Curated annotation (Swiss-Prot):
A matching Pfam family: PGM_PMM_I
Protein name as catalogued: Phosphoglucosamine mutase 2
Gene Ontology molecular-function annotations: magnesium ion binding; phosphoglucosamine mutase activity; phosphomannomutase activity
Phosphoserine found at: 101
Annotated source species: Shewanella sp. (strain MR-7)
Keyword tags: Isomerase, Magnesium, Metal-binding, Phosphoprotein
Gene3D superfamilies with a match to the protein in the record: Alpha-D-Glucose-1,6-Bisphosphate, subunit A, domain 3, Alpha-D-phosphohexomutase, C-terminal domain
Gene: glmM2
Length: 450
C-alpha cells in the first residue's frame, strides 16, 4: 500500500495550500498522537526551522496532539538532527520537525522521529495516514476527555545541549585552533548553533547568512546556493567554508581555492580516512544518484559500495540491514551512524575537519583521490499529468533506451520522480561531458512533451 501524504521526507508542500494548512496540521497532530498514544506515548518534542509559517503549524500541531492526550515539549528553531537527538535525551516518545529543509520559505513540511532518533517506518506512517484520512473525510476528530488533554511546555536550554552533543563527537585531543572557517547557516535553524560549535572547538569563524527573518531561509545561500560561501572563502582567505541547508541536515564544503566539495566527495574523504586508520567498518551506502566516480574510488581501496533508493531514510535502512556505518547522498546528507542516528550536517562537518587535522592535508588534497564523472541533472517541472504516468509512456522509455545505447558501457541513465516536488529528475553520467549533456537534454525534452 502506497503512502498518500508522506513523501520521502514526511509531508511537504506550499504553505496555505493543502496539505500544508493549519487544519491539516492539527488533524495530522491528532492522528499521529492517537497512533503514538496507543503504544504508550506520553510526550512529543516539536522543533522547527526559521520559516515564518513555522509558528502557525507548530500551534496547530500542538492542538492536535493535545486533543489526542499527548503532551508537547517545544524547543523552538532547531536543526532537524537536533530534534532527533533531543527527543531521545529528553526521554520524549517521539519528535516532530516542522521544516521544508532546503526549499524556499513559502514551502513547509512536517516529519516525525521515533524515540530512538530514527524516522518513522512506512508501516507507522500508513497507520497515521489511515486515521488522518478519517478525520479529513468527516471533518472531525475525537478529542479525549478534558482531564486527559495533553499539556504544553517550552524547553529553553535545547540549543546548548545540542551544541555540547556536536562537540562531543569531535576528539578531545584535537583542536580547530589555527583554522579560519567561513560558516553559511542559510538563515536557517543552525544560525545560533553551528558558528558556536566551531568557535568553541578553537576555530576562527566568519559567520554569514545567520540573520533569519522568517522569509530569507535558503534564499540564495546555504548548501544549495554556494556562490556567497565561495566568495567569502576567497575574500577572507579562509582555509575552507561550510554550508548547511535550512534545517542543517545536509552539508557542503568549499575548499581554500573556492572549489565545491559535495556529498559524494565527503563520503570518499570519510571512507578514505577510516580505511587508512584501519577503522573502516564494512562499506559505504550511496544512492541511485551517487556519482560513479565515488564507487570507482572506493573500489580501488577494496571498500564495498551499495546504492539505496534516493532519500536519507532509505540510506539509513540499507546501513542497518548491512550493519555498516557510513552512507549519504551527493546533496550533502551524510550518515555516520556511530555518531548520529540521522543525517547531521554539523556532525558530518566535524568528521571531515577531523580527517583534515589527522592527515595534515588540506581539503583540496583529501578529495583529490576521487575523480568525479561528468554528471548532468535536469529537473523537468510537471505542468500536467502525474510523474508515474509520464515515466510509463513509451516515448520516454524509448528515449532512455536510445541514450543508453549511445553511452554504451561508459555511462548510465536514471529517471526518477521527486518525492517532495512535482518534478522528474533526469540524470545522465558518462566519461564524456558533451555527450552527457547532449543525452540528458534529449531525454528531458522527451519528458517535457510526453
Amino acid at each position: 500500500m502506497s503512502r498518500k501524504y508522506f513523501g520521502t521526507d514526511g509531508v511537504r508542500g506550499k504553505v496555505g495550500t493543502f496539505p500544508i494548512t493549519p487544519d491539516f496540521a492539527m488533524k495530522l497532530g491528532w492522528a499521529a498522537g492517537t497512533v503514538l498514544a496507543s503504544t504508550g506515548t506520553k510526550e512529543v518534542l516539536i522543533g522547527k526551522d526559521t520559516r515564518i509559517s513555522g509558528y502557525m503549524l507548530e500551534s496547530a500541531m500542538e492542538a492536535g496532539f493535545s486533543a489526542a492526550g499527548v503532551n508537547v515539549a517545544l524547543i523552538g528553531p532547531m536543526p532537524t538532527p537536533a530534534v532527533a537527538y533531543l527527543a531521545s535525551t529528553f526521554r520524549a516518545d517521539a519528535g516532530v520537525v516542522i521544516s521544508a529543509s532546503h526549499n524556499p520559505f513559502y514551502d513547509n513540511g512536517i516529519k516525525f522521529f521515533s524515540n530512538t532518533g530514527t524516522k518513522l517506518n512506512d508501516a507507522q506512517e500508513l497507520e497515521i495516514e489511515a486515521l488522518l484520512e478519517q478525520a479529513l473525510e468527516h471533518n472531525a476528530l475525537q478529542c479525549v476527555a478534558s482531564e486527559k488533554l495533553g499539556k504544553v511546555r517550552r524547553i529553553d536550554d535545547a540549543a546548548g545541549r545540542y551544541i555540547e552533543f556536536c562537540k562531543g563527537t569531535f576528539p578531545n585531543h584535537l583542536s580547530l585552533a589555527g583554522l579560519k572557517i567561513v560558516v553559511d547557516s542559510a538563515h536557517g535553524a543552525a544560525y545560533h548553533i553551528a558558528p558556536n560549535v566551531y568557535r568553541e572547538l578553537g576555530a576562527e569563524v566568519i559567520s554569514i547568512n545567520d540573520k533569519p527573518n522568517g522569509v530569507n531561509i535558503n534564499d540564495h545561500c546555504g548548501a544549495t546556493h554556494l556562490d556567497s560561501l565561495q566568495s567569502a572563502v576567497m575574500i577572507h582567505e579562509a582555509d575552507l567554508g561550510i554550508a548547511l541547508d535550512g534545517d542543517a541536515d545536509r552539508v557542503m564544503f568549499v575548499d581554500h581555492n573556492g572549489h565545491v566539495v559535495d556529498g559524494d566527495e565527503i563520503l570518499f574523504i570519510l571512507a578514505q580516512a577510516a580505511y587508512q586508520k584501519g577503522e573502516m567498518q564494512g562499506g559505504v551506502v550511496g544512492t541511485l544518484m551517487s556519482n560513479l566516480g565515488l564507487e570507482l574510488a572506493l573500489k580501488q581501496m577494496g571498500i564495498p559500495f551499495l546504492r539505496a533508493k534516493v532519500g536519507d531514510r532509505y540510506v539509513v535502512e540499507q546501513l542497518k540491514e548491512t550493519g555498516w556505518q557510513l552512507g549519504g547522498e551527493g546533496s550533502g546528507h551524510i550518515l555516520s551512524l556511530q555518531h548520529a542516528s540521522t543525517g547531521d550536517g554539523i556532525v558530518a562537518s566535524l568528521q571531515v575537519l577531523k580527517a583534515i587535522l589527522e592527515s595534515g592535508k588540506r581539503l583540496a588534497e583529501l578529495k583529490a583521490g576521487m575523480t568525479k564523472l561528468p554528471q548532468v541533472l535536469i529537473n523537468v517541472r510537471l505542468t500536467s499529468g502525474s510523474a508515474d504516468s509520464i515515466l510509463s509512456k513509451d516515448s520516454v522509455k524509448q528515449a532512455v533506451i536510445t541514450a543508453e545505447e549511445v553511452l554504451g558501457n561508459q555511462g548510465r541513465v536514471l529517471l526518477r520522480k521527486s518525492g517532495t516536488e512535482p518534478l522528474i529528475r533526469v540524470m545522465v553520467e558518462s566519461t564524456d561531458i558533451s555527450l552527457t549533456q547532449q543525452q540528458a537534454e534529449y531525454i528531458a525534452q522527451a519528458v517535457k512533451v510526453a
